[in-house]
């Protein structure tokens, strides 16, 4: 069995399979053959033999060159929705790695919450300006908050959202959530679940709003001036979903005017962010370069999940994190 993989050529260390990891994989696959796929390359050998594809960069042109393709496993939570028509037509199975990021992303969200609420991020600015003293810190003292027993709205109560909710619940926080499917049973640690169409009402009065939404026709620019103006003045907005769900011009305005207290942004519309971006000048904003899911044991988890599914695939059993076609059409 041939397995095509595009995870060898990334210039970023945590996004590629290194030699040590590859040796572990080869020991596991035994009789199967894994071949490197470079999507940008026109001519490649053995694509017509590939039955399983493992990676993030598969596209419609590649699928056309792989007539025997039966299963695609994305090494990410996001899915390339441009391949929707082809995989539906050919009935190709699609899985992703949504559960691998929950601990890392929830840790990032908590770091945003504590840094912005306690003003520790601001101390880095004071340090750079050689003003690291109580007198200068006093300028933001009115925005300093006690995290415990505050309220949080989690917009997207999936695998990652539930992990965040559980951690915040342990801090005594009041948990509210947005869930696309309103027919779910409410977890005991969540006080109330809203439908997405009630988002404006849901953000009102919450201390923290955490966005986990993917970009779809219904969510593009959903966080705009109307939503930001519905938030309480000392609220903190956190985005670890997708940059395209936020109208960045509107967000920039409310942050400049201190209409909300601050923001923690791991994702932007354009990545990497331009060093000329006005967001970088704001002291009430923390920006990270889309690294919320990074962790030093990622590949151990990734390999474990892929090979568990490979065993299931060979046994013709149900695959973990199998996506339905409606999810794929939306890109998640």
Range-by-range predicted roles:
Residues 1-95, 202, 224:
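An N-terminal-biased, well-structured beta-alpha scaffold segment characteristic
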Residues 157-158:
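Glycine-rich Rossmann-fold phosphate-binding loop(s) that bind the pyrophosphate
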Residues 161-162:
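N-terminal Rossmann-fold NAD(P) dinucleotide-binding loop
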Residues 92-151:
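Phosphate-binding beta-alpha-beta segment of Rossmann-like dinucleotide-binding domains, i.e.
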Residues 75-76, 93-100, 197, 241:
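Short beta->alpha connector loops at strand-helix junctions that form conserved
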Residues 234-236, 240-332:
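Rossmann-like dinucleotide-binding domain for NAD(H)/NADP(H)
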Residues 182-278:
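Rossmann-like adenosine-cofactor binding region
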Residues 170-188:
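NAD(P)-binding Rossmann-fold cofactor-contacting core
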């Amino acid at each position: 069995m041939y397995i095509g993989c595009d995870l060898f050529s990334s210039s970023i260390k945590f996004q590629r399979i290194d030699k040590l990891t590859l040796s572990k994989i080869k020991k596991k696959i035994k009789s199967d053959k894994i071949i490197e796929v470079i999507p940008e390359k026109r001519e490649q050998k053995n694509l017509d033999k590939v039955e399983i594809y493992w990676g993030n960069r598969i596209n419609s042109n590649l699928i056309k060159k792989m007539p025997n393709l039966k299963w695609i496993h994305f090494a990410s939570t996001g899915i390339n929705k441009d391949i929707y028509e082809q995989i539906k037509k050919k009935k190709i199975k699609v899985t992703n790695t949504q559960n691998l990021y929950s601990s890392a992303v929830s840790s990032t969200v908590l770091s945003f919450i504590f840094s912005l609420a306690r003003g520790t991020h601001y101390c880095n600015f004071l340090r750079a300006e050689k003003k690291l003293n109580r007198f200068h810190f006093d300028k933001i003292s009115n925005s300093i908050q006690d995290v415990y027993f505050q309220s949080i709205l989690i917009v997207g109560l999936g695998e990652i959202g539930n992990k965040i909710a559980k951690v915040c619940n342990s801090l005594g926080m009041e948990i509210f959530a947005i869930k696309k499917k309103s027919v779910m049973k409410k977890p005991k640690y969540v006080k109330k679940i809203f439908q997405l169409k009630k988002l404006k009402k849901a953000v009102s009065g919450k201390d923290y709003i955490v966005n986990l939404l993917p970009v779809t026709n219904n969510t593009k620019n959903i966080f705009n001036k109307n939503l930001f103006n519905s938030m309480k003045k000392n609220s903190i907005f956190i985005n670890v979903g997708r940059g395209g769900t936020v109208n960045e011009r509107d967000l920039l305005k409310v942050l400049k005017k201190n209409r909300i207290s601050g923001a923690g942004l791991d994702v932007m519309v354009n990545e990497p962010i331009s060093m000329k971006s006005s967001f970088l000048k704001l002291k009430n904003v923390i920006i990270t370069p889309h690294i919320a899911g990074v962790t030093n044991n990622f590949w151990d988890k990734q390999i474990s999940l892929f090979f568990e599914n490979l065993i299931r695939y060979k046994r013709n059993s149900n695959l973990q994190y199998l996506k339905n076609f409606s999810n794929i059409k939306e890109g998640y």
